[in-house]
Structures are given as structure tokens and as C-alpha cells.
Design a protein with these regions (language model features):
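Gly/Pro-enriched, hydrophobic low-complexity segments
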Residues: 158-245
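Mid-chain, structured segments of secreted extracytoplasmic proteins
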Residues: 70-111
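Short hydrophobic/aromatic-rich beta-strand segments that constitute the beta-sheet cores
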Residues: 55, 83-87, 105-110, 118-119, ...
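Extended lipid/amphipathic-ligand handling interfaces
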Residues: 42-44, 72-77, 207-213
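Sec-dependent N-terminal signal peptides
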Residues: 4-12
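Flexible, processing/modification-adjacent segments and terminal tails
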Residues: 18-42, 48-49, 67, 101-178
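A short, Trp-centered hydrophobic/proline-enriched beta-strand micro-motif
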Residues: 48-64, 84
């Protein structure tokens, strides 16, 4: 079994599918593609950790004019009843995301020095996190919550066969994305690449960059976000030697 982390979130801690089993084709009709897309998005939303997890890493930020910054980050995930709680902690603020089956994600951002977190919703999810190019909604994979999901094809990414999932919101919010394309590895359902668009223009590219075999399993070591509008970059580098709970 492989473990991947997509956007700091461990997705494939469930048993991988049999790679020798024939893959069902992508339907030729739009209705069938939407049904497949809805099922895929639901399965991704429903992934849960078996145990609590803690992973340390760094946000390596390159600003549009070349200035660089390094921000240590700690990712924690734990179960709370049927919900999964994911926490991204930095010296610049802490984001908590509560994911409950069949309910919208809940986001709470606690600024440095604040006693409690502020609930974030709507356009507030476009707020950047810790000076990086990640928004709060990016970290919560908010596009998987959108009502319009469609598998539009199949392609190889990082030498893995992937379904291409097209996600569209019910309404495009100011500063938000008009649609998102993601390449989902078929057997482990790991997101290997994500492209975010405004209108017909791609504005962000999220891509797994390197992996390392750790404790007998392949794990993501580096994820890069490229901002096509500003030419800024943010790399998340994970310390795979960090102890896990």
C-alpha cells in the first residue's frame, strides 16, 4: 500500500485497489461522466485517517520579485466522532478544518495571539495562508465540495494512470475559481496534480514534485504550488523523519 499526502492531507491510508483488475472506461456521454465524477468526489471527501497523524514541514515561499521566506508548519489530523479535524499550524496563524460526512466543511482561522479561531466562509476562504500562495479553501480541498463534478478523461501523470476530474462551483465567488481540474491516481485515489482556473485562464498549478520511501511506503516529500498570475512559488517540504502518532 502506498501513502500519499495531497495538500498535506493523507488520502490513501485505505487498501489500494487491485491493479490487475480491468478499469471501467470513462463514459462517452456527459450524464455518465457526471455520475462518475460525483462518485469520485464523494469517495475523496469520505477518506478518513485510521490513526491520528502529525507531520512537520516547511513552506518555502518565493515572492513575485524573488524575495524568499521559510515558514515552519505542522499538520495534524484526528478523528472527532464522524468528523475529521485537520489543523495547519504556523507562527503566522493556525487553520482548523472540520470535515463531516454530508455536511459543508467548517473553517476556523486563529490569528497569532488570538484566544479563539474565527469562522471563515464564502469569500473568506480565498484568504491566503501564512503569506503563501495557498488559500484556506485550497488547503481544505474545497472544490471537492462543489455540486458539479465530472470525469472528463483519463491520462498518465507521474507515470500513474489518473482520472481527470473537472469541478465547478454553483456560483463563482469574487476572487474564486471558475473551475478546477485534478488528476486522481486511479488505484490509491491520490491527487497528483491540480489546475485552478478563472474563466479560461489557468491561475494556479499544484503538483507533487518528489517522493521518498519511508517506513516501507512511498510518501510525498515535496509539493509545489505555482501562481501563474504573479509568478510566485510555494513549496511544501515534509520532514519524513518526524515522529507519527
Amino acid at each position: 500500500m502506498k501513502r500519499f499526502i495531497f495538500f498535506l492531507i493523507i488520502t490513501s491510508m485505505v487498501q489500494a485497489a487491485d491493479k490487475g483488475k480491468p478499469l471501467p472506461p470513462v463514459p462517452a456521454d456527459v450524464a455518465g461522466q457526471k455520475a462518475m465524477g460525483a462518485a469520485l468526489a464523494e469517495s475523496l471527501r469520505g477518506m478518513r485517517l485510521v490513526n491520528e497523524a502529525e507531520i512537520k514541514g516547511n513552506l518555502r515561499i518565493r515572492k513575485p520579485r524573488g524575495k524568499r521566506e521559510n515558514v515552519p508548519v505542522t499538520f495534524r489530523a484526528k478523528a472527532d466522532g464522524a468528523a475529521q479535524v485537520e489543523i495547519f499550524e504556523t507562527a503566522k496563524g493556525t487553520l482548523q478544518i472540520r470535515k463531516t460526512p454530508n455536511k459543508p466543511n467548517e473553517y476556523f482561522f486563529k490569528a497569532p495571539g488570538a484566544k479563539v479561531g474565527k469562522k471563515m466562509e464564502g469569500e473568506q476562504l480565498n484568504q491566503i495562508f501564512a503569506g503563501s500562495d495557498f488559500t484556506l479553501g485550497d488547503l481544505g480541498l474545497e472544490f471537492l465540495q462543489w455540486p458539479n463534478q465530472q470525469v472528463i478523461g483519463r491520462a498518465s501523470r507521474l507515470r500513474e494512470t489518473c482520472n481527470i476530474l473537472l469541478s465547478k462551483p454553483a456560483k463563482v465567488l469574487p476572487g474564486g475559481y471558475s473551475h478546477v481540474k485534478c488528476w486522481v491516481e486511479i488505484h490509491n485515489r491520490a491527487l497528483l496534480c491540480v489546475e485552478a482556473y478563472r474563466g479560461g485562464k489557468r491561475v494556479k498549478l499544484f503538483q507533487a514534485k518528489s517522493f521518498k520511501k519511508f517506513e516501507g511506503e512511498w510518501q510525498l516529500r515535496e509539493l509545489e504550488l505555482r501562481n501563474d498570475v504573479t509568478d510566485a512559488r510555494t513549496q511544501i517540504q515534509f520532514d519524513l523523519r518526524a515522529p507519527r502518532k
